[in-house]
């Protein structure tokens, strides 16, 4: 089969060419097209023969469900057995967009499309070419990513051509995609909504719209290959480059040292090595190929570049890839989900085993002392020394009287609470430092040149809270009480995270 490639400007659609593409879908053929996430491989979702062609062209296991792409909410009502109220709320908030919802399937959807499941995955893409193609075809379009199964997903038409030329009727070249990782998938068939695949839309965003808890499938990060997949990407090795890939996790200093050690040992074996890094770290690596995902602060860039870089490694014919990890605050879980699958869950953990926590604020007499007292009230799986320090301490002072009153009223002793100046010698390689405010973290890093910045955290940011712990100084006793409650809630999250990592 000869694959026709057409170029379409998404801002100025060529209606004749788009109709040609739509007619191919209607005739049972396959057409690759851009979406806002990755390129999709489309066929008539209600035609079992078209779905079989998709599986065949990709080399995709037939129990791996396909996502049905629609152009109007009424299409969901056509193919779902029932439409949950949660689906209506989420569609109002996020469609068209990178969100796939799993609902019970209606009789119109063949099992060939759902991988034998009684559920169907549905989304409305936010891309003018994709939406126009659905409408012109007169079909609902089943579309997984347009790549050979197991390879990195395509973010530009050239990637599709590399994998699928000669296997499908047409490729619509609409330029590079915007997001670069697949849609979030949420299962709405159970009482509690569950994210089965992380993406650009986070569980927190979903929970806010629904007004209730949204849980995360524990298999998202785990190497679990035993369950029948309810959504794409839950089973089988995914997104993988041809080279063996290993992720190195830990603080920046330890990751760089470990990767360079691995590069040296593999170079001795005559292997061509690539390192996946960031703009901030790329200059520290001595490898044959060093590829940057962009700035670590730019999560969108990291997501957008991931699949392109994995394909670049294939083109450069490297033998081994060592990559930094990318557990960024907002969509880091989605990025790491893809990276772990690409690496076959091969991870080297270089994290230091911390044995001490220092809480730091300004004077050493208030929030940091409350944090110390509260933290000692919790149980850590691995005991740690808990200290409190101030950034500006002229002489030892007892804890603030109002803070003391609040602590005592909550059954926490203040007997040994005296302000102490933070010194560089307090911070060893196995110390975690938590500040109450971003400015305090910056001051510590500026003052102590020899400490690792990755050991110093803003407490609220570390646990995923948006607001910093407010300073109650000068306020009423009630203000100190509110500060205590805020600290306790935040520290409960800290303990949960620390215990999960032990």
Name these PLM-found stretches:
Residues 66, 71, 388-393, 456, ...:
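A short, structured active-site edge motif that brings together acidic residues
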Residues 352-429, 496-502:
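Conserved active-site segments centered on acidic
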Residues 432, 442-502:
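Phosphate-binding/catalytic loops
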Residues 256-266, 273-277, 409-410, 414-430, ...:
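S-adenosyl-L-methionine/SAH cofactor-binding core of RNA-modifying enzymes
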Residues 54, 76-79, 160, 206, ...:
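Hydrophobic packing residues within well-ordered alpha-helices of enzyme cores
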Residues 1-352:
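Active-site-adjacent structural elements in enzyme catalytic cores
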Residues 56, 162, 337, 341, ...:
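Short, well-ordered alpha-helices that flank and scaffold nucleotide-derived cofactor binding pockets
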Residues 61, 267-268, 377-384, 448-452:
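Short helix-capping segments at alpha-helix termini
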């Amino acid at each position: 089969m000869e694959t026709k490639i057409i170029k379409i400007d998404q801002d100025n659609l060529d209606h004749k060419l788009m109709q040609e593409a739509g007619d191919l879908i209607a005739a049972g053929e396959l057409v690759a097209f851009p979406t806002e996430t990755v390129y999709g491989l489309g066929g008539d979702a209600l035609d079992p023969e078209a779905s079989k062609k998709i599986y065949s062209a990709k080399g995709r296991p037939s129990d791996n469900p396909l996502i049905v792409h629609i152009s109007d909410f009424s299409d969901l009502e056509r193919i779902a057995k029932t439409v949950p109220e949660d689906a209506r709320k989420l569609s109002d908030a996020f469609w068209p967009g990178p969100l796939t919802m799993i609902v019970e399937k209606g009789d119109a959807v063949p099992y060939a499309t759902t991988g034998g499941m009684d559920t169907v995955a549905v989304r409305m893409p936010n891309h003018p070419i994709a939406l126009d193609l659905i409408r012109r075809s007169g079909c609902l379009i089943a579309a997984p990513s347009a790549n050979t199964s197991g390879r990195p997903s395509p973010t530009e038409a050239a990637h599709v051509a590399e994998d699928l030329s000669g296997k499908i009727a047409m490729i619509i070249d609409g330029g590079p995609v915007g997001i670069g990782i697949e849609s979030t998938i949420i299962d709405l068939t159970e009482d509690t909504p569950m994210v089965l695949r992380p993406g650009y839309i986070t569980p927190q965003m979903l929970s806010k719209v629904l007004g209730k808890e949204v849980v995360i499938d524990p298999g998202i990060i785990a190497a679990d290959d035993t369950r029948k997949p309810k959504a794409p990407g839950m089973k089988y090795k995914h997104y993988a480059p041809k080279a063996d890939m290993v992720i190195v996790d830990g603080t920046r200093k330890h990751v760089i040292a470990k990767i360079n050690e691995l590069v040296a040992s593999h170079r001795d074996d005559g292997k061509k090595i690539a390192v996946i890094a960031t703009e901030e770290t790329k200059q520290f690596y001595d490898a044959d190929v060093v590829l940057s995902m962009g700035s670590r602060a730019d999560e969108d860039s990291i997501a957008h570049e991931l699949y392109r870089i994995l394909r670049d490694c294939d083109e450069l014919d490297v033998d081994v890839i060592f990559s930094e990890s990318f557990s960024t605050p907002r969509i880091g879980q989605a990025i790491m989900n893809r990276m772990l699958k690409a690496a076959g869950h091969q991870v080297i953990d270089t994290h230091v085993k911390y044995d001490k926590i220092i809480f730091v604020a300004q004077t050493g007499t208030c929030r940091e002392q409350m944090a110390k007292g509260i933290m000692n009230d919790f149980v850590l799986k691995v005991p740690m020394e808990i200290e409190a320090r101030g950034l500006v301490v002229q002489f030892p002072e007892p804890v603030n009287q109002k803070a003391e009153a609040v602590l005592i009223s909550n059954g926490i002793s203040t007997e040994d609470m005296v302000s102490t100046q933070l010194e560089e010698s307090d911070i060893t390689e196995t110390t975690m430092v938590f500040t109450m405010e971003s400015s305090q973290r910056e001051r510590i890093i500026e003052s102590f040149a020899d400490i690792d910045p990755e050991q110093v955290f803003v407490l609220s940011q570390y646990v995923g809270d948006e607001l910093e712990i407010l300073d109650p100084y000068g306020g009423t006793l009630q203000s100190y009480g509110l500060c205590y409650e805020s600290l306790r809630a935040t520290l409960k999250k800290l303990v949960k995270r620390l215990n999960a990592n032990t």
